Each structure stands twice: as C-alpha cells, then as structure tokens.
C-alpha cells in the first residue's frame, strides 16, 4: 500500500500534476530516507544525504517506526500519513517482494524459511507489530493520519478525499475522480513510473512488484498453525490497544 499512498499523496499535493507522474518514477518523487548507498551518478543524493540537501516542503517515504521521529513529532510541523495492513497479507506480499528483490538477504528462501525469519524478527525493519503500534500511539495526533489498506480498497474515493482534507487541499470533484482512476490497482500495475519495472535489482519474472492488490491472499501461503500464531500475536498486541485488522475471512 506504500506506493499506492505515495501516488495518491503526490497527485493531491501537486493538485493534479499528472505530467510529472507520467515522466518521473515514484522513487524519484519521494526520498526513501533510510536508503544508504552511493548512487552511480555522484550528483544524485539518496536517503539522509538527499534529506539534508533539500529544503521543505518535501515528500518523504519511510518504513521506520515512530520512535525514529520523536523529535519531529514533538515539533508538530511535519505531517505523517501511515498505512497499516493486515499482518498476514503483509507477510504474503513481503515474501514475494523478498524473492524478486535481489538486494534482499537470502531472497531465494522458501516460505517456511521466511516465516521463521518473521518469527525471530530477522526480516528487514524488524517487528511489524511493534512498528504499527508505534504509529497507532499517535492516532489522535492531528498531524498523523492513519489509513488501513483494507478500508482503502473498499472505498478508494473516500481515501483520496481524506488525504486531500489532511493535506488541506480543496480539490474539485472532477480532479478527485481522476486521481481515483489514476491510482486504481489496474492503472498503477501497468504504469512504469509506479510498477518498478525499470528499477534495477528486481526480477519481475519471479514476481511482479504489483501482484494482486487484494485482501486475503495470505490464505495461499499460511498453514493453519502459522495463521493461528499470527492471529494470537495480533490479539495480544493489536486488539488490546483497540487496533483491529481485517484479514478477508
């Protein structure tokens, strides 16, 4: 859901810059701040180096917990849009990304091996439950807007309108509809500026970056025991904090 929300945010923030969306890959329009590598072009900065080189307002992307942004959150100048997804569907999606992205460690592993990594907090970015809870703690902060992937799928237009309201952008109904259409899964899947087909290090023959865009695909991967374990963790960590996630069942 990250790329989906990025494109929605970009088109709203720029008030319909479809030309920019058509010409510039989404990973160039948003600085992925935790990236840490030297770009082949010495004039191109990435991650924190790019962050330091640019001045606000900026569009940023991160998979980090809110713990990394406590000082920023305290200043109340930056807005955060956070997308949650059911942990079982997240794991199924991440497993396929894990396989197709050559820059991931041990990307040729089986689902069972990947699930063991998850159980032992050995996947990139660590414990998914703790990460979501770190942002859930800010659910009443007026500068933090939390979306659930499942709700976005149910009512894409409502999601677009909520992002527009959060960013204080008064857009026409016509532009809202155009953004909804442009950010549909069908449209994004075939858009080379969004589907990472031109991005190195990803083998789309193993798995496309944009696969299905639906709820419940986890049932094609999880054993009953694995599903039970994740449900138990969700109940213990999420539901005790008032966070409930749909799993398509």
Describe the role of every protein-language-model region.
Residues 88-91, 157-164, 173-176, 227, ...:
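An amphipathic alpha-helix signature
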Residues 3-15, 147-171, 179, 187:
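PAPS/PAP-binding and catalytic site of the sulfotransferase fold
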Residues 65, 86, 150-152, 182-185:
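Short, solvent-exposed coil/turn elements at secondary-structure transition points
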Residues 2-147, 193-249:
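PAPS-dependent sulfotransferase catalytic domain
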Residues 117-118, 165-208:
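Catalytic lobes of large eukaryotic enzymes
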């Amino acid at each position: 859901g990250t790329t989906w929300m990025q494109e929605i945010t970009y088109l709203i923030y720029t008030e319909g810059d479809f030309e920019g969306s058509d010409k510039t890959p989404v990973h160039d329009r948003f600085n992925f701040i935790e990236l840490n590598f030297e770009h082949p072009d010495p004039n191109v900065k990435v991650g924190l180096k790019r962050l330091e080189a640019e001045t606000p307002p900026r569009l940023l992307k991160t998979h980090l917990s809110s713990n990394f942004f406590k000082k920023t959150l305290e200043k109340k100048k930056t807005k955060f849009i956070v997308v949650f997804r059911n942990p079982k569907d997240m794991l199924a999606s991440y497993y396929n990304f894990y396989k197709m992205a050559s820059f991931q460690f041990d990307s040729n592993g089986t689902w069972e091996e990947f699930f063991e990594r998850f159980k032992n907090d050995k996947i990139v970015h660590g414990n998914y439950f703790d990460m979501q809870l770190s942002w859930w703690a800010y659910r009443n902060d007026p500068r933090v807007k939390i979306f659930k992937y499942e709700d976005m799928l149910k009512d894409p237009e409502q999601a677009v309108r909520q992002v527009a309201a959060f960013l204080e952008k008064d857009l026409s109904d016509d532009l809202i509809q155009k953004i909804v259409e442009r950010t549909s899964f069908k449209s994004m899947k075939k858009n080379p500026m969004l589907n990472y087909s031109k991005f190195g290090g990803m083998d789309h023959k193993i798995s496309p970056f944009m696969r299905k865009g639906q709820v419940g695909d986890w049932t094609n991967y999880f054993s009953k025991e694995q599903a039970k374990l994740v449900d138990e963790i969700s109940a213990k960590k999420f539901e005790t904090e008032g966070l409930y996630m749909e799993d398509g069942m």
